Amino acid sequence: VAVVPYEVRTELTGPRKLAAVRAVTTPQRLSTDIIRLLDQVWPLLREQGARTGHNVVIYRPGEGGELVIDAGVEVPEGFTARGEVRPVDTPAGEVATTTHYGDYSELSAAYAALERWCATSSRPLSGTSWEVYGDWDDDPARRRTDVYLLL
């Protein structure tokens, strides 16, 4: 398997409108919690006939190694909030970003590349990041995830 180096770039990003559910989780529960949260969002959006985009997860540091996450779906034209599903915007501002192709379990390599770039560029991290998941593909090598670190 050929290792493709990550191309890191900076961008100014505007907010993306999401329908999302917030939770506090741990790295060990992360994948299970993301699926559980998205399983709350999608039925509501289908019921409302909302125009949807990609799945997005925003990560913020929590207490004692926990993570505060907002797991949701892009809703460019909005939706009607209900229950725990509420409107959330991705952060706006300058980011370091890269694109990962491969299984989600290998995303740590993309984060390592971004963190190396920030360290060598003397760019401090805010602690907030998010992932935008491309369309599903049964072939893990074709799964695209765009990773953003807020600077």
Regions found by a protein language model. Name each.
Residues 1-151:
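A solvent-exposed interaction/effector surface
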